Amino acid sequence: MHSPGSTGPGDGRAADIMDICESILERKRHDSERSTCSVLEQTDIEAVEALVCMSSWGQRSQMRPLTPVSDSGDVTTAVLMDTAAPDLPKDFHSFSTLCITPPQSPELTEPSTGTPVPSQVVNSKGCMVTALPPSPAGGPRTLSKREPLEPASGSSCRAVMTSVIRHTGESPAPTRFPTGPTQEQRASDSGEGQERLLDHLEALQDTRLANGLLVTNLVSCQPCLHKSGGSFPTDKGQQTGWPAAVQTCLPKNPESDLSRKITPLISVPVSSPPVLCQMIPVAGQNGLFSAFLKPPTQLPAGTIKPILPQAASMSQPVFMGPPVPQGTVMLVLPQNTFPQPAACPSSVMAIGNTKLLPLAPAPVFLASSQNCAPQVDFSRRRNYVCNFPGCRKTYFKSSHLKAHLRTHTGEKPFTCSWDGCDKKFARSDELSRHRRTHTGEKKFVCPVCDRRFMRSDHLTKHARRHMTTKKIPGWQAEVGKLNRITLAESPGSILEPLPASG
């Protein structure tokens, strides 16, 4: 691990920082001894090196950029450095601190009595993120992200540094980084090394676009700590074993990478939607409905399941509770719970844009422009129109239209076959009705007074007379008819008069 700086005016400040680092290492060593782990962790070394790098921010001739790459979208920048072996680690750390992320740093700083120290945050992939406090020169608070390192593969001292920042921004733009000066540059106060590195940066960007060599070296993100062969030496006097290349830390697929981050964190059991039974009373039913519920499929306690697909959008729930094991649920509702809908026929009744289906528990709202009306509506449309001049009557059936046309033409094809009767009729039902006048058949019987009629319309008119005088509902008339039939069929009725005694 290199020293904070042997020359320069910041020796006193560097000594203070080293005291803080030694206190941190002492505390970490004490914690590791308590946990029966005597090996110094790699994250501690990286934290100390990040603190050492802080000593050079106040001596820079240029201000540190605020998120140089994060505002321009997903940009991958490679920096090629050709420097001497002793100077390479210092440039490496100065460049690594520029690989920063958007300024939303986590509020996980560790309190201390003296100078604030950086806090170490390890994400789900094992990459260490070090939050640095603001520098005295007014530098912004940023995050420094370390990339995974590999052991040196040869005597070459060329190092490729890659900054990967995924951030929502604008179109990518070329980025220039102010580089950290080495010890020799601080002593001579010259910017030749910075200009040389910027030239290498532009040349490398052109080369990368031409041959795409860096594309073949992309690997998926791995933990920053290697299992063996640590890249940072623990001795202050040794500077050997520095990496020759830095692997690019890019996810292969953003969607799959996000799923891998989220999946192992927490697994929340998803409960089923609630049971929502909504029953609307209909006139004549006394507000009593039976709701048939399917047996639930092993739901945990407290979860509820919906029955109707359209019940979730209704605004007036009636019953809400846990699912029943099995069987039938009877819901008894007061008559004033819901507004009484109009009585509908057995097929379909339309009220404006509301379609009341025969067995539906709630009305289904359909737009008048939609072509999804039930099939029964098409069968009840008046498609047959009379084309006689001045008559535009419509009918449901073609036979009815033909019978109507005979009234215009005067045609009467149905003739009575009774002896001495030559009457003709335009419709067959009229002929059948006329035949009953010859036979005397009266097939329509009143259920109240047992009067018989030849025609059904005559019976309807007679029954209406009963309803207006006695105010007897139709179902009571049917019950009275059944009672009379039962009394007539029972032998030895008590209502029969007793024979007179002689």
Curated annotation (Swiss-Prot):
Region (Disordered) location: 133-156, 169-194
Protein's UniProt keywords contain Disulfide bond: no
Top-level taxon of the source organism: Eukaryota
Chief localisation class: nucleus
SUBUNIT field: Interacts with SIN3A.
Residues that span the membrane, as ranges: none
GO MF terms, alphabetically ordered: DNA binding; DNA-binding transcription factor activity; DNA-binding transcription factor activity, RNA polymerase II-specific; transcription cis-regulatory region binding; zinc ion binding
A single cellular component GO annotation: cytosol
Protein name listed in UniProt: Krueppel-like factor 11
Keyword line: Activator, Apoptosis, DNA-binding, Metal-binding, Nucleus, Repeat, Repressor, Transcription, Transcription regulation, Zinc, Zinc-finger
Deletion consequences: Mice breed normally and are fertile. Hematopoiesis at all stages of development is normal and there is no effect on globin gene expression or longevity.
InterPro entries: Znf_C2H2_sf (IPR036236), Znf_C2H2_type (IPR013087)
Induction conditions: By TGF-beta. Expressed in a circadian manner in the kidney and epididymal fat tissue.
PANTHER family, alphabetized: KRUEPPEL-LIKE FACTOR 11, KRUEPPEL-LIKE TRANSCRIPTION FACTOR
Role noted for this protein: Transcription factor. Activates the epsilon- and gamma-globin gene promoters and, to a much lower degree, the beta-globin gene and represses promoters containing SP1-like binding sites inhibiting cell growth. Represses transcription of SMAD7 which enhances TGF-beta signaling. Induces apoptosis.
Cell compartment(s), UniProt: Nucleus
Stored SUPFAM superfamilies: beta-beta-alpha zinc fingers
